[in-house]
Each structure stands twice: as structure tokens, then as C-alpha cells.
């Protein structure tokens, strides 16, 4: 009996011993970082106070990737949010007037605000991360609509303390659940939707859609409203705004959700985003149109696009190497994963580059752009590739799209190929610039998202 008790105690102590040993080695790694106090406090909490190994690993995941996430520096953003709050509370203003006023104040006082950013590791507190880890971990452990997730899925679909850069570090899980989660208190008990991921997700989506009184205005409206107080109150947002509300509201309710996007949007217009849930079957079900359509109802069966990226918390290693080595760094973002082949048929392409053009280039990185409906800037960069053995090489490109390859000549990006169509059979057909601008070529025939 004594030996049995001793063995039991040893088994009980194993998680504690594991966390303590990890904490000791991890803290030594951060010793030289001047901002290590909050990190050490977080690791200490999950090694001594709450020694659950998976929580410790979740904390490590957050810390290891935090350098890829940014917030506004300084307090000027709060002046902007205060102004936005006063606009949204003014019932005498129409959504158009609210939007136009916000655009005016952005251009006159806050247009340079996104340039002044700071890494989250210099701002975030251990208490805030503990709040997010504990909240999401409890949902993963107890909610029937989240229990299908593996631990690795949990790290990306539920855990992150933010969904996009510049999102306010506030208690959005509690705030948005209070706005859109009342249905969880009185669920409809039936034999079909009850406690399913899709059933709960559509309940949250429907409540958000009906309570926000959204008035879709798809023109520029100033800096995005990224605080949990303002997000549910905006009436003039665009599709990405409401897709963000969707993914945050779902995560607040314990529904596994992520945010996907394309750099070139509807019919070669602006970029767009949508949210995705992971169902009980492990299927990834898309929202198609922000909050206004049912989840999983089909995803644009007639469309195709150049690229689709998933907003992740983990830093994309390909993008990280690019940001370190490129002589010209395009602002792709460090935490975006290429998932184009989950939506479309794709091709890896190799484009021969003339020797005389190669001599003018100052970097091994090259770029691929897709056509957009903008006379001033008719091409939008969608990805980067590399120049190897005299060829510009690009991977995982969407088919039946009009492209052009570009390179860095020391001053900026310049075309290094003629425009070309990547056909369904992966055949590359070059077309002249005159043909691209000719009415004879219906370049919008192959609509993107």
C-alpha cells in the first residue's frame, strides 16, 4: 500500500516537475531580454501556480511568436477611438455621415498613426496573457463545440489574444460574449444542432448580424475600429470589418474560428476577408460573406483567385526569412500562411527572365502581381518568389488569373515579364501591355473573390 501511495504521488508530481524544469531553462533564455519580467512571470505562473503542461506549452507558443504581432505605440489611438465613440453614439448622424466624419478626422489628424507601431512584447502583461490562456483553455476543455480540436489546432483556432495587428489589448472575449452570446444561456435543445460547432456558430453569427444593424458601406472610412467597445457598435463597416467581428465573437463563445483573406478581392477590387470555423467533423466551413450568410453554405463556386492567406498567430518561417534577407521588403506581414491550394487548383510556375533584365535587378527575391481595377495602380502584389537559374519561380499560384512578374532594380519594383494568363491547365500565355488595355481582352472575365 505504501509503494502504491508513493507511485501515486510521483505520478501526481510529474506535471509539476515537468513545468518547473521547463521554466528554469526557458527563463535562462530570456535573461538577456530587458523586457523579460512579464515573460518570466507568465512562465512562473504555469510552472508553479497552475502547473498544467498544456497551459505551459500554450504560454510558450504565445511568447515564441509574440515578436510577429504589433499594436499602436503611444496613446494617440485612444483620442481617435474617443472621437469614433462620440460619432457612433450620435443618433442624429446617418451611417454615411459617421463614416465621412471618421474619414476626415483620420486624414487630418491620424493618417500616420499606423506607422508608429510597437511589438506587443513591450506592451503586454502577464496577467492579460493568463486571462486569455485560462479563458480559452477552459472553453477547449469543457465546450462540446470545441472538444474536437487537437492541441495544435487549439493554439491557432481559440488561444490567440488577438486576431489582427493593432487590435486593442482589451477583454474582448467577455465584451463580445456579452453582446452576442445570450443564446448560449437558453439553447434550443434538439437532436440536430444542439451543442454542435456549426449550430452554436450560426447562433452567434445570427445574433451579431441582427443586433449590429449593419449598414454596409464599402468605401474607405478611416482607420479601422479595433477595440471591443467599438467593434459591435459600428454601422458603416466593410466586409473585413464584419468578418473580424465574426471571428472574435465566435472565439469568445469557444467556437474555433480563423480569419482567411485574399490580397485581391471581388472582381479584381480591394482585398477581402472571411471567417472559417472547424466543425465537429473537422471540416473547415467558410462564412462566404461576413455576417450576412450562413456558415458552410458553399464558397463562391464560380470564382477563382491568385492567393488565399490565413491569418495565424504563429510566425510564418518563409515570410520571416524573406523579411530578414530581402533588400526590398514588401509589407506582406509575418503571420500569414499560404493556403491557396485549399480553395483553388494551383500551379508552381517558372518564368524565364531575359539576361539583360536580370543584370538590372539588385535582389534574388522577385514578386508576382495580379490585375486590379485601379487606373493609378493597375497591379497588386500578391506574393514573392525567388530568382534561380535565370527563372522567376513562384509557388502555389491560383489558375486562370492575369499576372505580371516584378523585381527590385534598386529604386523600386519594375516589371520583369510581360503580363501573362496562367490557364487552368497551368499553361502560361504572355500578352502584350496593349492587349491588356484593349477592350478585346475581357480581363475581368476570370473574376477573383
Predicted regions and their residues:
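Hydrophobic/aromatic-rich core segments of domains that either
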Residues: 31-33, 186-207, 216-229, 234-329
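Short, ordered, surface-exposed loop/turn motifs in non-cytosolic proteins
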Residues: 356-376
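Short, acidic Ser/Thr/Gly-rich low-complexity loop/linker segments typical of extracellular
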Residues: 374-390
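Short Pro-Gly-centered beta-turn/loop motif in secreted/extracellular proteins
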Residues: 388-413
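Structured interaction patches on ligand/partner-binding surfaces of diverse proteins
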Residues: 409-438
